[in-house]
């Protein structure tokens, strides 16, 4: 059996995938620690434990160059495109929103990379932004869908993390319900993301990946602003790691 491991060392989370003859058989997910290399090592040891042969290891993400035992290192753009096509073969565009960056990837009919945009200069519109506002209002990102269900969003004027946090506090003091503020934040983020995607004139189907893709409220609001379907997948957060594992699988097959 041919084994390939892909590890995506992100700024917020470290994700790992084991492919066995092209099938996902193991997953690994932990928050990225102060020393990302320790999470990469843990992922490698956990995913390969008990295997009869040593897997091919491909690293991607911010921390991909922090260890010296990988067989290959690949940029996250290539990996996210491949991972998206693995999860949803018809995908023509990927919107990935992680902890501290967001990216849009445009693919052709064959799944090849056409173009991409990346925003890693500002926390607005990222998982970190959503996390800060959620914590300010006494909840967590994991609870957003249930809290904001059937809630009318309150207008949010600032998308700067610092100013938006102050605005959320002011609105709460003025008596605005926290769930309405949170729905407003999600709506503002979705609108910003839609404008970002529109810069590439992307075609459907679109796959939404990254940690924020778990928020179905965000996905539905993004659909509304884009006026086209936005798909999600239970393994969407692992797209980068999946793509890395696919690359490793291809390299091993050619040998």
Curated annotation (Swiss-Prot):
Protein origin, superkingdom: Bacteria
One GO molecular-function entry: 4 iron, 4 sulfur cluster binding
Record's keyword annotation contains Metal-binding: yes
Record's keyword terms, sorted: 4Fe-4S, Iron, Iron-sulfur, Metal-binding
Pfam families reported for this sequence: BcrAD_BadFG
Cofactor note: Binds 1 [4Fe-4S] cluster per dimer.
Ligand binding ([4Fe-4S] cluster): 122, 160
Gene3D superfamilies: 3.30.420.40
Cofactor dependence: [4Fe-4S] cluster
NCBIfam families, per database record: CoA_E_activ
Self-association and partners: Homodimer.
Name assigned to this protein: Uncharacterized protein YjiL
Organism: Escherichia coli (strain K12)
């Amino acid at each position: 059996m041919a084994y390939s491991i892909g590890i995506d060392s992100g700024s917020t989370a470290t994700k790992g995938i084991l492919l066995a003859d092209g099938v996902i058989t193991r997953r690994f997910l932990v928050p990225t620690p102060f020393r990302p290399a320790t999470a990469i090592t843990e992922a490698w040891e956990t995913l390969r434990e008990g295997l009869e042969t040593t897997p091919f290891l491909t690293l991607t993400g911010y921390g991909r160059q922090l260890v010296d035992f990988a067989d290959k290192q690949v940029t996250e753009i290539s990996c996210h495109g491949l991972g998206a096509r693995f999860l949803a073969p018809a995908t023509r565009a990927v919107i990935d929103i992680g902890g501290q960056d967001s990216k849009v990837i445009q693919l052709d009919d064959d799944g090849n990379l056409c173009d991409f945009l990346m925003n890693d200069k500002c926390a607005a519109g990222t998982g970190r932004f959503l996390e800060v506002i959620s914590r300010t209002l006494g909840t967590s990102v994991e609870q957003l869908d249930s809290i904001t269900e059937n809630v009318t969003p309150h207008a949010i004027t600032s998308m700067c993390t610092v100013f938006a946090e102050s605005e959320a506090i002011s609105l709460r003091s003025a008596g605005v319900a926290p769930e309405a503020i949170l729905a407003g934040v999600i709506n503002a983020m979705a609108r910003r993301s839609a404008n970002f995607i529109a810069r590439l004139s992307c075609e459907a189907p679109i796959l939404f990946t990254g940690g924020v893709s778990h928020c179905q409220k965000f996905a539905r609001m993004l659909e509304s602003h884009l006026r086209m379907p936005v798909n999600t997948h239970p393994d969407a957060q692992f797209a980068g790691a999946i793509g890395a594992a696919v690359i490793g699988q291809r390299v091993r097959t050619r040998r």
